[in-house]
């Protein structure tokens, strides 16, 4: 018997807030979304992998960024669920959403070291934005995640 989509488990994931020297936030526009939505690097945690190692791995896989230092692990975990239109499509239908652990990191490299044309590219474009712009550029079902992340980051950097 097939599981109901609403009974699917949450995927264990990480998200990374990358700040440059001017405290601007790295965001990238996804290949698979035709609208002008941007997101911070994020992804799943592999079996046997801890959250921090997953964050470093995902960041490098998606952006080629290696020169970062951990500023702080954000408090708690933040969960989002996929809207009905994406249930059963994203992640090969295995999950209904993600439960994410977020990390704040400082990028110590140069912009020309960032490369989104990776082995398995996820992004079309990238840019640095002000922290307050985060909630203006994100897809609707992740808005509450970005609001929470933004508030935590602002407390740390201000």
Task: Identify the residue ranges that each predicted region occupies.
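A conserved beta-turn-beta hairpin within the catalytic core of GNAT-like acetyltransferases
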Residues: 33-36
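Charged phosphate-binding loop/patch that engages nucleotide di/tri-phosphates or the phosphate backbone
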Residues: 135-158
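A short gly/proline-enriched turn/hairpin at secondary-structure junctions
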Residues: 39-40
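Short loop/turn segments immediately following the C-termini of beta-strands
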Residues: 30
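Acidic, metal-coordinating catalytic segment for phosphate/diphosphate chemistry
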Residues: 1-19, 92-93
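Unchanged
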Residues: 46-140
């Amino acid at each position: 018997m097939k599981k109901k989509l609403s009974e699917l488990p949450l995927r264990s994931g990480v998200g990374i807030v990358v700040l440059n020297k001017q405290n601007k936030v790295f965001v990238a526009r996804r290949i698979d979304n035709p609208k002008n939505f941007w997101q911070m690097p994020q992804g799943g945690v592999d079996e046997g992998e801890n959250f921090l190692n997953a964050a470093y791995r995902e960041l490098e896989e998606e952006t080629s960024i290696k020169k970062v230092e951990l500023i702080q692990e954000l408090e708690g975990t933040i969960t989002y669920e996929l809207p009905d239109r994406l249930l059963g499509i994203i992640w090969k239908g295995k999950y209904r959403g993600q439960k994410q652990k977020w990390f704040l990191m400082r990028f110590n490299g140069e912009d020309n070291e960032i490369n989104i044309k990776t082995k398995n590219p996820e992004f079309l474009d990238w840019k640095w934005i002000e922290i307050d712009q985060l909630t203006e550029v994100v897809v609707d079902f992740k808005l509450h995640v970005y609001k929470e992340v933004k508030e935590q980051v602002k407390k740390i950097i201000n």
